[in-house]
Amino acid sequence: MDLDTITSISTPMGEGAIGIVRLSGPQAVEIADKLYKGKHLLNDVPSHTINYGHIIDPESKEVVEEVMVSVLRAPKTFTREDIIEINCHGGILTINRVLELTMTYGARLAEPGEFTKRAFLNGRIDLSQAEAVMDFVRSKTDRASKVAMNQIEGRLSDLIKKQRQSILEILAQVEVNIDYPEYDDVEDATTEFLLEQSKEIKQEINRLLDTGAQGKIMREGLSTVIVGKPNVGKSSMLNNLIQDNKAIVTEVAGTTRDVLEEYVNVRGVPLRLVDTAGIRETEDIVEKIGVERSRKALSQADLILFVLNNNEALTQEDYTLYEVVKNEDVIVIVNKMDLEQNIDINEVKDMIGDTPLIQTSMLKQEGIDELEIQIRDLFFGGEVQNQDMTYVSNSRHISLLKQARQTIQDAIDAAESGVPMDMVQIDLTRTWEILGEIIGETASDELIDQLFSQFCLGK
């Protein structure tokens, strides 16, 4: 594939020990040699070596930076192109200067995700593996990173390719049936083979979809909304879980006027914690905006932490709020157990029925462990499944698998109903195409561009 040479900073901007400028493309080594001065020309050194030298401005002859340069020659590289990585001291000014010099002497600034896109276009990885690269970068927990690494290694890809190959074998048998319709024994054998193989494919798709709920949570986080009357301790709970003071905690009811969101690792489960403004009628315009956002957050939540105040008796407002959330996955928390108990716990139990109940004191940090265990148990039965198994964690993949399950079921129904094989062939082919979209073999250029545009620069 004839592509130009791209360049980008591949490390986070800011002060640090090391900053890396990466080049990839047919002119990568040549461009670097125009700037690099060391014991040998980079063009003359072996592949996969690191070389000490300096970056020199060819025009002013000024020494710009002391560097270590990695030379990686195609095809045994991430992009399957020649790659140069210039390791600089991690300062904004210097690394930008090196980047500008690479562009001055022939490289183009890379688009977001373009290095990974080239790896995909050059056949180094497929689309699901490319998406997993960004999942790995963005992972919030050890489990999430392991799920992403599993996909980077191609385990999901291998399963999808296996199912697509099975469909091709069915289609080949169907073609024989279509070409020789006069042989009844061929038709009977084809129908039997089609049904047997199609049901196995559907079973495998179902197995993958069964991992989707856990996989999606590990990838995106469990959207968890903290809700309750104003001043029951919602923000204190958020702060205790994230060990931060992002939310303002005061004695004035209604001081959380917006939706505050933070990620937290709860026993290996990534929670996307949302602290909402108290949901109540208000004339304050700023607070009213926060209340509306709270209602929206509630409608999108995977888990709701419903907080009550141990120091106050249940009110009609508590009952009204619980009525709003009771049909969702809820954990009820009676907070402020360090204060005098004015709430009737039996009344609380009557209101919530079998809903889990935890008693906490955020001030004394009591009950937090019990809360974390309850969250884990509620969604994962106390233990996430074997980390070596292949999870489907990407919403796009889950959607496509659901479509594939439907089209393979359509093929099964049609075959069992005696529909002509050329009609069954349509559903089988569509299933093959849908599965191909997961790994990028049948994905449109527009979809590919859109997916890679979500990557960070330098990746």
Swiss-Prot record:
Locations listed in the record: Cytoplasm
Binding site for (6S)-5-formyl-5,6,7,8-tetrahydrofolate: R22, E85, R124, K459
Highest taxon above the source species: Bacteria
List of residues binding Mg(2+): S235, T256
Pfam families, A to Z: MMR_HSR1, MnmE_helical, TrmE_N
GO cellular component, one term: cytosol
Domain TrmE-type G per the UniProt entry, residue ranges: 221-380
Cofactor dependency: K(+)
PANTHER family: TRNA MODIFICATION GTPASE GTPBP3, TRNA MODIFICATION GTPASE GTPBP3, MITOCHONDRIAL
Subunit structure: Homodimer. Heterotetramer of two MnmE and two MnmG subunits.
Name of the protein: tRNA modification GTPase MnmE
Gene from which the chain derives: mnmE
